[in-house]
Amino acid sequence: SQKQKEKKDLVILDGRPFEEYNKMSIPGSICVPNAEMPYKISTLVKTPKTEIIVNCAGRTRSIIGAQTLINFGVQNKVYALENGTQGWFLSNLNLDNNKTNYLEIEPNKNEIEKLRNKIINLLEENHIEIIDFLKVQDLINDDTRSTYIFNVKANFNSRNSIYGIRNVAGGQLVQATDNHVGVLKSRIIFFDEGDLVRAGTTALWLKKMNFECYVFKGKEKKLRSLNFNHHIKFKSKSVNLITFQDLK
């Protein structure tokens, strides 16, 4: 609030999904879901002198968003806003409601290429494999392991129409993993629009949570011919029953 009053050179990025941002937000902030931040930051911040402040509703997603930008080598000073919108409200500061400031601008081709090279290096350093369609099918065909596949591009206007694939924004997949992935240490395949940045960003965080992560090098349309028809091996044993009388 003080920095805004002093008209400092800064931007406030809200790393939550649009639905949460729309409900309540910090005045002057822009909705940029966490996994989109490294992909879109260059369209908004043009000078390294601009301070970047990341907020959420509390603290977790602001820390994840800020650290993601730092990991990508952003030269600006990056801060995570302590206690987020809740702390703002408890400090007797006014929140905005029903705002629609969503950063939809896409980076240019040259910037996307730079970002792609950066994420490829980060994935290699963290031993996360970038795979093609055949490898995706091989992983799905392996009925000895649970494999999930997600489109992590944040898009509040549409959802995936491919059977077996869910659209979950990368930031939310990191924030609420147990809502979407039911098997600990399972395999997870991530993809986006082919830039690899959003899928790679999400994979880097999930790898730290002991999931076996892969990034698909391609777009959604290439996955329409995936075959999800396989048998699940599950052997059940009969349950021994006991009556109330036997318990006496």
Spell out what each predicted region is.
Residues 1-11, 15-148, 152-248:
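Rhodanese-like catalytic fold shared by cysteine-dependent sulfurtransferases
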